[in-house]
Structures are given as structure tokens and as C-alpha cells.
């Protein structure tokens, strides 16, 4: 880059969907808010990781009221985020904060293990759009290094695409 030519920016987003601890309930479960685009009824019954104040990741399970405890009206109603919690095994707010080290504002991420099947030549994982976009920028920048171009190339791995670029 010499600063005298038009600039072409290669851009990909590096963030991914997740949650944030909004409150710690008296029974030790966590209320969460969404970071990015989620469909509420897809959230319960999944393993997640909650980062604590020590930087450790605590396993948890997203939960909602079981259908056998719901009224017929509740079963027909859309699931609201206020009715979704994360259970990390704490039995009180104090235990969640002191023993588990969880604070309001801590990130919560889905536990999705990357796998590759040689039989089908398929990968299973999360955030491929983010990771592949950033990898494509790096590979392109590497391939273009040292080439004479009539433009300057800039690579950017941006954030906040998942939350509406606020």
C-alpha cells in the first residue's frame, strides 16, 4: 500500500451470536439476554459455557419451564426470553457469585464442538460465516503480498454484525 491509489477493503465479521448474564436469580439460575439473532424456542435444552470473573468457563444448560408444568395457554404462547434461564448447578445467588464466580455481564456461548467427517467430507460447527470470512481475507492478503496492483488492499475483521452494527 502506498496511499496514492484507490483502496479496496476486504471485510468479514469476526463476532458470533451468544448471550450475556443479565441477572442472577435467588435460586442460582442465570437470566440471560441475547447477543445476535436467536429464535427463542431454539434456545432451551442446549449446553453453554458461562465465563466467570476468573476467565474460566463454567458449563451450563439453557432451560425453560417444562411442558408438563405449563398451562395449555403457556404451551401455545411464544417463548419469551424472560422465561429462559441457564442452570450451572448453583443453588443460590450467593453460590453462583461466590463459588462459581459468575457476575452480571459475563458472556455465555453455545457449546458446539467442531467435527469433521471423512466419510461425508462435511464439517459441523458454529460461526463458519465468521471464521471462513476472516480466513478468506487472510489467505487473500497472503496471496496478494508482493504483487503489483493498481489499488491498495486493506483487510478488516469487523465486529458487531451479529448485534445490528450498533
Predicted regions located by residue number:
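N-terminal hydrophobic/helix-forming segments and targeting peptides
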Residues: 1-166
